[in-house]
């Protein structure tokens, strides 16, 4: 997999987990306190590479482990 494919897969999985948890993009952004809802959208579309801190903050709010976001 190349970088773009990894980011798109990560984004699709993030969107699925966010929806499962019942958060909107804005709601997740507010709960993490780290970014705006449109930034969550960019992550979900694979348009940006989130920092490790952002990923960990999202995982904490959604109460998930990394393997839910990236499945090899």
Spans of features found by a protein language model:
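A short, Lys/Arg-rich alpha-helix, primarily the initiator
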Residues: 1-20
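Short alpha-helical elements of helix-turn-helix
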Residues: 12, 37, 52-56
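Residues in the recognition helix of alpha-helical DNA-binding motifs
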Residues: 17, 31, 42-43, 72
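Short alpha-helical DNA-recognition segment
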Residues: 22-42
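DNA major-groove recognition helix of helix-turn-helix
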Residues: 43-44, 54
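DNA major-groove recognition helix of helix-turn-helix/homeodomain DNA-binding modules
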Residues: 51-68
